[in-house]
Amino acid sequence: MREILPIESIKERDIDLVLLEELNVNHQFCEWFIQSVGLPEITAHEGAWRSITAYGKGETDILFSYHANDEKVYVLIENKLDAYFQHEQSKRYDSRASTYCEDGSCTVAFTVLVAPRQYCENQHDFEQYVTYESIGEFLRSTGGDRGIFKNHLLDIAIHKLRRGFQAV
């Protein structure tokens, strides 16, 4: 018998919502996420927001804010599943990060790509990245049935990429 998938097709927005939930309610995930890219250690959580447009410099898929001692940290997350980067997209992320620091919204800001491993390893626009595979493994190993289900959703997204998209 053929496996029945809980969802036929995963879109980037679906993964955004998984990330948004975890970054807002799962402190252990937040700590793991920032440690996996070597960001300053979290001392207080502020929150995460989806689809933030700022300064006329494009959109941030997810903006995650936390405190590291007396520093307010912004993490601008670009989630990429099966599309090419827009022209100078990473530069616009860097520009928004700099502007957030300059206008006092935060003390320090970082940009991070979240995507399937195949995508991350074949791009040169973002220096820091977290793979869908590592997120899925973390959720599977720490989140009980809920984490196993979310890992399954990420696996569906990863297989979607493998079936039809090649990052260049």
Regions found by a protein language model. Name each.
Residues 1-168:
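Charged, terminal alpha-helix-loop-beta segments
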